[in-house]
């Protein structure tokens, strides 16, 4: 396939073959909001970035005075309940991403945002759940990535080389296809 002269590569990683593997939490599962918020606050005090993937966890932090460096949201919780944002950031980005996939271009977008000193919000038209993968690969060691585990709580991943290796291993098992 010739892609050299295309402005946009229309390829995705597809994860249909990995649904079971991806359904379990890959970090610390917090079921108590007070313990969760205390942990996040201490991480911020130590100078690490907080990155959220999901509307509900982003909103819980915001309502408790914690503003994530980067939020990846789609405006919904459990795929249908609209979420209204209380905080507006200076830098907002919009991407499209199908459920069960990650578009190649999103890796570069997230990497660039995490290099920027201001962070921002990525609004996803589609599904944001799997964008934990490019977030972890682009985050610095020590940063914390938070996502919601439906009907369970919030999962916190402390980024390190072991986690990045695990995420790269999952990515290698994904199927590359046209979006």
Curated annotation (Swiss-Prot):
What does the entry list as the binding residues for GTP?
55, 57, 74, 76, 128
What's an example Gene Ontology biological process for this entry? coenzyme A biosynthetic process
- Top enzyme category: transferase
Q: What Pfam families would the database entry show?
A: DUF359 (PF04019)
Q: By its UniProt entry, which InterPro entries does this protein fall under? A: GTP-dep_dephospho-CoA_kin
Domain of life the protein comes from: Archaea
Question: Which keywords does the record carry?
Answer: Coenzyme A biosynthesis, GTP-binding, Kinase, Nucleotide-binding, Transferase
Write down the EC number.
2.7.1.237
Query: What does it catalyze?
Result: 3'-dephospho-CoA + GTP = GDP + CoA + H(+)
Query: Which Gene Ontology molecular function entries are recorded, alphabetically?
Result: GTP binding; kinase activity
Q: Does Transcription appear among the keywords?
A: no
Q: In which pathway does it act?
A: Cofactor biosynthesis; coenzyme A biosynthesis
Stated role: Catalyzes the GTP-dependent phosphorylation of the 3'-hydroxyl group of dephosphocoenzyme A to form coenzyme A (CoA).
Family as reported in the entry's similarity comment: Belongs to the GTP-dependent DPCK family.
Name-wise, this protein is GTP-dependent dephospho-CoA kinase
Per the UniProt record, the source organism is Saccharolobus islandicus (strain M.16.4 / Kamchatka #3)
């Amino acid at each position: 396939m010739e892609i050299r002269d295309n402005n946009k590569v229309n390829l995705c990683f597809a994860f249909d073959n990995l649904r079971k593997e991806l359904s379990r939490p890959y970090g610390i599962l917090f079921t108590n909001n007070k313990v969760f918020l205390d942990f996040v606050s201490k991480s911020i005090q130590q100078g690490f970035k907080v990155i959220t993937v999901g509307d509900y966890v982003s909103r819980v932090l915001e309502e408790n005075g914690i503003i994530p460096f980067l939020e990846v949201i789609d405006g919904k919780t459990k795929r249908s309940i609209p979420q209204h944002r209380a905080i507006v950031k200076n830098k907002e980005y919009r991407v499209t991403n199908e459920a069960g996939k990650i578009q190649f271009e999103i890796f570069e977008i997230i990497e660039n945002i995490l290099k920027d000193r201001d962070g921002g919000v990525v609004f996803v038209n589609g599904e944001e759940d799997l964008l934990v993968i490019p977030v972890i690969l682009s985050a610095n060691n020590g940063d914390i990535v938070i996502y919601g585990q439906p009907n369970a709580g919030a999962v916190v991943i402390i980024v390190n080389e072991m986690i990045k290796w695990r995420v790269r291993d999952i990515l290698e098992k994904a199927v590359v296809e046209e979006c």
